[in-house]
């Protein structure tokens, strides 16, 4: 027997029919729409972050030497670029697998594999973002203890573009975090049915 609190929690996440009663098809449609929207946003954020990072260059002359900083000079930035490309490709592929889930007879194992995919993409994104954030912090503030000087006061445009690319990657991460929450909710609701 379901408790009143349990029933109200289920209703909170379900859409209601015109008569006020929740329907499975409306709830299913809203979940699929949320999945597609979040995946589309993740694609948009990652595909935008890639060219922003690739085009980040600012030639500067230091002590008579011409230097052009680029993402290629930082393994963390190359890693983030690779992560963004990977997440973009796998998210585009995952859109093909979300569409069949709209049927009410979908097997729970399909949701599990999609959730597993979402977890791997989330972990990739947060690791790439963390690496880029560490390098960005050192570029902005330096580390006096090890005599690393900040460079962002010299190459402001380059640092600004790297920041934009990293922020876009973080936005893709938050999309995947929301996808994970949706997946867990779906798996939990199926387990209690």
UniProtKB/Swiss-Prot annotation:
Report which residue ranges the record marks as coiled coil.
none
Q: Which UniProt keywords apply?
A: Cell membrane, Membrane, Transmembrane, Transmembrane helix
**Could you list the residue ranges that cross the membrane?**
36-56, 79-99, 119-139, 162-182
Q: Region Disordered: list its residue ranges.
A: 1-25
Q: Which residues lie on this side of the membrane: Cytoplasmic?
A: 1-35, 100-118, 183-193
Q: How does it sit in the membrane?
A: Multi-pass membrane protein
Major localisation: membrane
UniProt xrefs under Pfam families: CASP_dom
The listed locations are:
Cell membrane
Residue ranges in the Extracellular topological domain are 57-78, 140-161
What GO CC terms are in its UniProt record?
plasma membrane
Similarity comment:
Belongs to the Casparian strip membrane proteins (CASP) family.
Tell me, how does this one assemble?
Homodimer and heterodimers.
> What name appears for this protein in its UniProt entry?
CASP-like protein 1F3
Source species, please?
Populus trichocarpa (Western balsam poplar)
């Amino acid at each position: 027997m379901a408790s009143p609190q349990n029933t109200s929690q289920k209703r909170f996440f379900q859409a209601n029919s015109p008569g006020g009663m929740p329907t499975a098809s409306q709830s299913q449609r809203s979940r699929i729409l949320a999945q597609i929207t979040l995946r589309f946003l993740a694609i948009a954020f990652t595909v935008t972050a890639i060219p922003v990072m690739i085009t980040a260059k600012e030639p500067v002359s230091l002590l008579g030497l011409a230097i052009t900083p680029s993402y290629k000079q930082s393994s963390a930035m190359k890693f983030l670029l690779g992560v963004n490309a990977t997440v973009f490709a796998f998210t585009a592929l995952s859109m093909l697998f979300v569409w069949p889930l709209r049927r009410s007879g979908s097997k729970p194992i399909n949701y599990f594999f999609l959730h597993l995919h979402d977890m791997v993409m989330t972990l990739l994104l947060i690791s790439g973002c963390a690496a880029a954030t560490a390098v960005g912090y050192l570029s902005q503030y330096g580390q006096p203890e090890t005599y690393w000087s900040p460079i962002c006061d010299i190459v402001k445009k380059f640092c600004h573009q790297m920041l934009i690319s990293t922020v876009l990657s973080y936005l893709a991460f938050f999309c995947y975090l929301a996808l994970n929450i949706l997946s867990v909710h779906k798996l939990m609701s199926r387990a209690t049915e």
